[in-house]
Regions:
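A polyanion-binding, active-site-adjacent surface
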Residues: 2-206
């Protein structure tokens, strides 16, 4: 169940309120076994009115301890390369497919994605971004509803209903592979070019 199941932007409440409501429903979630080993639920963070939403895989150790996505080494990398797209962390919204850390940072299991994905879909519906950047295979597979690998999907934009989707490498993987880091940076420059060519309506009139 991916982004294509979102029929339209139907939230009547302000986006900030809608996100608070989703987080309240999430509460002390025990819909899968990950609650047994987590320290914190990592809901998401950022600008509720962001044009660009980043979706990663799952919290890592630092994220689990601090309760915020992308705060470890991968987060530092993400913060740095956001500037290549003309963005700052406070401009975007960041979330993960899973809200709890899988033990040993293993890949999400299908039953975990099934349990957690309704919360992500509601976050997407509330924020209603123009662009979704999927970081790594699990997020890309969820959003684009495909099993094709990230190396074949990155480097271009994909239209999924209202949303423009840009798949790219997860910063954690790119930190282990200099060639992927270069491609990740290329993708962020491409994102910046796209944003310049497609300004937000309020920007276009300036």
């Amino acid at each position: 169940m991916g982004v294509m199941h979102i029929p339209g932007h139907t939230h009547q409440a302000p986006r900030e309120v809608a996100l608070e409501e989703i987080e309240a429903v999430l509460g002390d979630c025990r819909l899968c076994q990950l609650y047994q080993s987590r320290h914190n639920i990592v809901f998401g963070v950022g600008n509720p009115r962001a044009r660009v939403m980043f979706i990663g895989e799952a919290p890592g150790r630092n994220e689990d301890l601090q309760g915020e996505p992308f705060v470890g080494a991968a987060g530092e990398d993400l913060n740095g390369i956001l500037s290549l797209a003309g963005l700052r962390r406070e401009d975007v919204y960041i979330a993960n497919v899973l809200k709890c850390r899988p033990p040993g940072n293993r890949n999400p299991r299908p039953e975990e994605v099934l349990a957690c994905s309704p919360f992500l879909r509601e976050q997407i519906r509330s924020i209603w971004p123009d662009i979704i950047v999927t970081l790594g295979n699990p997020a890309t597979h969820f959003v684009l509803k495909t099993e094709i690998g990230i190396t074949k999907l990155r480097g271009r934009f994909h239209q999924m209903g209202h949303f423009v989707v840009m798949p790219t490498f997860h910063p954690a993987a790119a930190l282990r592979n200099p060639a992927w880091q270069e491609l990740l940076e290329e993708d962020f420059k491409m994102l910046g070019d796209y944003l310049e060519r497609h300004p937000a309506p309020e920007d276009a009139s300036e």
